[in-house]
Amino acid sequence: MIRNYIAVFLIIPYLACAQTENKSATYKENNAKIQVEMDNVIRPAMQEFNIPGVAVAVTINGENYFYNYGFASKETQQPVSSETIFEIGSISKTFTATIAAYAEVNGKLSFSENVSKYLPALRGSAFDKVSVLNAATHTTGGLPLQFPDEIIDNNQAIKYFKTWKPKFEAGTQRSYSNPGTGLLGMAAAASLDQPFEKIMEKTIFPALGMMHSYITVPQAQMKNYAYGYSKTDEPIRVNPGPLASEAYGVKSTANDMIHYVDAHLQLLKLDKKLQTAIQNTHIGYFKIGEMTQDLIWEQYPYPVEVSQLLAGNSSKIIFEDNVATKISPPVKPDANVLINKTGSTNGFGGYVAFVPARRIGIVILANKNYPITARVTIAHHILNQLDRLAPLKAK
């Protein structure tokens, strides 16, 4: 009997070692294959669009791979790494949606209630008839993409909202809007009785394990904060306008952002309420063409053609009013979909996409606002490669 136990204890370390070596070999093999595909699409794009630096991260069933190109600063020639901090632009909106969903899970916020319930300053305004859900799905009734130029701070934004008149009935047209997402963030923060920035930086980011993500980059991390580059190739960083924190204010790394994707793929051990909130952001509420509008996120049935993604991320969808068909009842979170979001500031361009059923995802961060068509096309190509490498059955 003793001999049998000894034999077992001798075998167990051997098996563990063999499994680790096999995993390592698979990782290296996948990494080499992805590197070739990545080089084939990233390097030509950098040359065509004069992009100084790009950080790409992908995940396959929780295994993360990183591919870095070029410079975080052309002036200092500091190379891009997975710890380089990029402005993620409107991808920030997905974190705002997460805060709102988190407030709902905690019984503090209802998406069916009107915005003015949580923002007393707007009572008696058009927002007595605009729901929190409308703010989370760009269906407020025609809020513009940006605030008028004369609106320069949050107090002026509130005054603007007080007198704003809708073009449409709420819930009938999708009008992509930074002010609308700003309202969502304000309502969520008010329901939680905390400043928006504090909730993001002290609750959401730490709970997600995103230790190098910020609204305000601390002085100690400025050395890792990339410079963006304008159309005229001048080094720039975002100049925050009203409600910037809620709409486009997050700065993050490829490492943190692929961790965020893993959270959406349910591959991390998170607080139960936060995980529920994240999954609730995948609920589909409106159809706009072939795209389903979730809470900020946009989704498509998977597999999806690149033409469908390009249509859903087109200038028409971003800059124009589009008919929104309400889905009743809303579509519960589905695994067989591709979920995506673009993000830009004047000097940065980003894209995030993931497929829950295949447990694959990609994050592309660049310090140049290059065409969305290129971002989508690159990501679609890489995701197709990841799909081939993904296990037939996710663990």
Language model features with spans:
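Bacterial Sec-dependent N-terminal signal peptides
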Residues: M1-T26
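Catalytic loop of the DD-peptidase/beta-lactamase superfamily, centered on the K-T-G motif
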Residues: C17-Y69, A189-Q194, K198-E201, P206, ...
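Second-shell loop/turn segments in exported
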Residues: S24-N31, I85-E87, P120-R123, L145-P148, ...
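Extracytoplasmic/secreted proteins, especially bacterial periplasmic and envelope-associated proteins
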Residues: K33, E37-P44, S90, F95, ...
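Short active-site loop at a secondary-structure junction
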Residues: E37, P44-A55, E75-N134, P166-G180, ...
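Short, solvent-exposed loop/turn and secondary-structure capping segments
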Residues: Y67-Y69, L145-E150, I215-Q219, A374-V376
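The feature captures the short pre-catalytic strand/loop hairpin that immediately precedes
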Residues: E75, Q156-K167, G228-P242, P329-N336
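Active-site helix/loop module of the DD-peptidase/beta-lactamase fold
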Residues: E87-I91, A103-L143, F147, T163, ...
